[in-house]
């Protein structure tokens, strides 16, 4: 396991309407590690995820990415810091292909037109690199839940994220799909 620290939080706090839901949360994640946040309902798992990914702002504390202090006030700040998130509710468009979904909103362009050939090549390279059972031209509507989750992962990885956060990634998966997802990770 690498000693390279990707994320560090120090004493992160958050309150809603005067009720403290996070108090002095310290977290360290190194390159190549996989972590699970576990706890009872209301323990603050989703809140810390939402702070790290820019959905919520913290009330106090510090966040460091690659040893550098960062201020994350929104999702754009998180993305700029190299943080990608996959929420329980997938954000794929079923009527589009795997490639179209992965590049939706940040298409590669050649003079005046989307560079479909290059986007497809990059998606195939990602599929090959991670060993996912996907085809770049396959319609998302035809994919099973595990394959859709893999498509979301590829979408996040296509941005060259340093840190990938998955919020309850197995909630809607069968036992075999969950196993396939864990093998991939």
Enumerate the language-model features and the residues they cover.
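Glycine-rich phosphate-binding loops of nucleotide-dependent enzymes
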Residues: 2-185
